[in-house]
From Swiss-Prot:
Annotated keywords: Cytoplasm, Methyltransferase, Nucleus, Ribosome biogenesis, RNA-binding, rRNA processing, S-adenosyl-L-methionine, Transferase
Main location: cytoplasm
Enzyme Commission (EC) number: 2.1.1.183
Protein name: Dimethyladenosine transferase
PROSITE patterns cross-referenced by the UniProt entry: RRNA_A_DIMETH, SAM_RNA_A_N6_MT
Family of this protein: Belongs to the class I-like SAM-binding methyltransferase superfamily. rRNA adenine N(6)-methyltransferase family.
Keyword presence, Methyltransferase: yes
Residues that coordinate or bind S-adenosyl-L-methionine: H37, L39, G64, E85, D113, N128
InterPro entries in UniProt: KsgA/Erm, rRNA_Ade_Mease_Trfase_CS, rRNA_Ade_methylase_Trfase_N, rRNA_adenine_dimethylase, SAM-dependent_MTases_sf
Function recorded in the entry: Specifically dimethylates two adjacent adenosines in the loop of a conserved hairpin near the 3'-end of 18S rRNA in the 40S particle.
GO cellular component: 90S preribosome; cytoplasm; nucleolus; preribosome, small subunit precursor
Annotated catalysed reactions: adenosine(1779)/adenosine(1780) in 18S rRNA + 4 S-adenosyl-L-methionine = N(6)-dimethyladenosine(1779)/N(6)-dimethyladenosine(1780) in 18S rRNA + 4 S-adenosyl-L-homocysteine + 4 H(+)
Length: 318
């Protein structure tokens, strides 16, 4: 990766980039509250773009392009780039940077909040992600009607490690289990804080996220709903998570909805609705032999087995 980058970037190019960044720093102050930490190392920037394996026919979505250090490299390889930028100052600087160049017409800048923006079709996503939207960004990509073929995403190191964590790891959590259901995640590189201007307080990592195709035949909201319950306390038993009054209230409500949709009636001889739902939960946990397991030790197959068993008795999570 380093050798390929050296062929493309001479010392003169790096000096020009540094001068531009110093100019920007004097023009306006970076807003770190918006996650504005500009990637300044050209070798890292080129490495990120290379890992995306962009085809000449690809439309690339870039989230948070900033001053365009990644953007200009993506434009060299992609058919088009759609850059979503929240800060008008950054958008203006990026516009100036490509103005009058051969790639100017290949760039579309969408000004606004990524999480509130309706996205066009795109093949690849590349992002030096504002860390405060890391989790929402991942799930927005996963839930796109036509998800990207691949996403190359820069995250805070600890967040990236949570995406990669396996059952039994200390960082394994609901995020790990949820994302790994829908996508394959691999680690690409570590990026030190000194590669950014201004330097963030934490180290970063770049991950490659490939959404599974075909998509697993599981309802996203049902899967997410189950995980929210079992991971409330990942080191407690799964059965403990179902003893919460709040959880029971939700599941009772969902069960009533299930009965109404199927024109079924509650069997009054079995007690109250609460008793009926509790009995179903206890039965499922016993029959699956998962009641005494800890979510932090369970894998995808365990959770799928649990979800299927609950559905079989009419218990739903969304």
């Amino acid at each position: 990766m380093g050798k390929a980058a050296k062929k493309k970037y001479s010392g003169a190019t790096s000096s020009k980039q540094v001068s531009a960044e110093k100019h920007l720093s004097s023009v306006f102050k970076f807003n770190t509250d918006l996650g504005q930490h500009i990637l300044k190392n050209p070798l890292v920037a080129q490495g990120i773009v290379d890992k995306a394996q962009i085809r000449p026919s690809d439309v690339v979505l870039e989230v948070g392009p900033g001053t365009g250090n990644l953007t200009v490299r993506i434009l060299e390889q992609a058919k088009n780039v759609v850059a979503v930028e929240m800060d008008p100052r950054m958008a203006a600087e990026l516009t100036k940077r490509v103005r009058g160049t051969p790639v100017e017409k290949k760039l579309e800048i969408m000004l606004g909040d990524f999480m509130k923006t309706e996205l066009p079709y795109f093949d690849i996503c590349i992002s030096n992600t504002p860390y405060q939207i890391s989790s929402p960004l991942v799930f927005k990509l996963i839930n796109q009607p036509r998800p990207p073929r691949v996403s190359i995403l820069m995250f805070q190191r600890e967040f990236a490690l949570r995406l990669l964590a396996r059952p039994g790891d200390s960082l394994y959590c609901r995020l790990s289990a949820n994302v790994q259901m829908w996508a394959n995640v691999t680690h690409i590189m570590k990026v030190g804080k000194n590669n950014f201007r201004p330097p963030p307080q934490v180290e970063s990592s770049v991950v490659r996220l490939e959404i599974k195709n075909p998509r697993p035949q599981v309802d996203y909201n049902e899967w997410d709903g189950l995980l929210r319950i079992v991971f409330v306390r990942k080191n407690r038993t799964i059965s403990a998570g179902f003893k919460s009054t709040t959880v029971m209230d939700i599941l009772e409500k969902n069960y009533k909805t299930f009965l109404a949709m199927n024109n079924e009636m509650v069997d009054d001889t079995k007690g109250s609705m609460h008793d009926v739902v509790k009995e179903k939960i206890d039965t499922v946990l016993k029959e699956t032999d998962l009641g005494d397991k800890r979510a932090g030790k369970c894998d995808q197959n365990d959770f799928l087995r649990l979800l299927y068993a609950f559905h079989q008795v009419g218990i739903h999570f969304s």
